[in-house]
Design a protein with these regions (language model features):
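Short beta-strands and strand-loop turn motifs
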Residues: 1-2, 146
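Rossmann-fold NAD(P)-binding glycine/threonine-rich loop
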Residues: 2-26
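Active-site-lining helix/loop region of Rossmann-like oxidoreductase modules
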Residues: 27-180
Length: 180
């Protein structure tokens, strides 16, 4: 089971090659904050024209990233929402490997890392890690907004992340599965 989804996003061809062998299967637990994955996969069958995800978190969640430092953003003095990145998921995910796993999974399950738009925001008004997912396509459109409590031990991730891994393991052993 893969825990760090950003690694999958950085090496998708290697993952697909390894998974092409009969004895190899990759299982990725859903990141703690993810929702709408089944709807996205279903919409892709009908045809997705646009897909974006915004990951907005309190400034503390973005500390320690070299990319943020190169922007010159002072997270301790931030008094308004600040866009740290906006562009293709392929370009943004490597800059925030601990924070945007949800974008990596959704992009890989959806229309790919190049066509998925990612916006990363540090917002001092937030107390929750917020993910806004917007999908448009031939079957219609949907928006999913998730607001998760940050992990007390690691504000870069949701407090649901460890439960997500447990749910994935439980699902592997279950004879009945709902969704994905």
């Amino acid at each position: 089971m893969v825990g760090r989804k950003a690694l999958l996003a950085q090496h998708p061809d290697a993952v697909l090659e390894a998974a092409s062998h009969d004895a190899v299967r990759f299982f990725s637990s859903h990141p703690g904050g993810i929702g709408g994955l089944d709807a996205l996969k279903t919409a892709c069958l009908a045809g997705v024209e646009g897909f974006s995800i915004q990951v907005a978190k309190p400034p503390a969640a973005w500390r320690g990233f070299r990319f943020v430092e190169t922007l010159g953003v002072d997270l301790d003095r931030l008094d308004h929402a600040c866009t740290l990145f906006e562009g293709p998921a392929r370009e943004g995910v490597p800059h925030f490997p601990q924070n945007v796993n949800i974008a990596a999974v959704l992009a890989l399950a959806g229309i790919g890392m190049d066509r998925t738009r990612l916006k990363v925001v540090a917002d001092p008004a937030l107390t929750l890690n917020t993910h806004t997912i917007l999908v448009t396509g031939r079957s219609g459109r949907f928006t999913v907004v998730l607001e998760n409590v940050p992990s007390p031990d690691n504000p870069k991730t949701s407090s649901l992340a460890c439960y997500s891994a447990l749910a994935a393991v439980r699902s592997l052993g279950s004879r009945v599965r709902y969704g994905g």
